Design a protein with these regions (language model features):
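Amphipathic, hydrophobic secondary-structure cores in small proteins
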Residues: 18, 22-64
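N-terminal first-folded block
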Residues: 1-27
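C-terminal structural segments of small proteins and small subunits
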Residues: 55-79
């Protein structure tokens, strides 16, 4: 599945989930899926907890997060080299 095809699985609608990016057809925020992955959950763990999702939905969240990281960044204090 191409990157563009994956992103078709993400929806942003002001009337759904407060306009937050979510998985199309579901009220599951992209950020929630990314938080699960960041905390150590595997794709399989997420699919077990959310059986209505498909593997490609989780991959779409990762692709969306990667695109956002290319466009924006979070301020993190610089660490001095030791």
């Amino acid at each position: 599945m191409s990157h563009d095809d994956l992103l078709q699985r993400i929806s942003i609608n002001p009337g759904i989930c407060f306009g937050k990016p979510c998985i199309r057809g579901h009220r599951i925020w992209v950020s929630l899926v990314l938080d699960f992955l960041a905390s150590g959950s595997s794709i399989e763990d997420i699919l077990e907890d959310y059986p209505q999702l498909e593997r490609e939905d989780v991959l779409a969240c990762i692709a969306y997060g990667a695109d956002m990281a290319r466009e924006r960044y979070v301020e993190i204090p610089l660490q001095k080299a030791s």
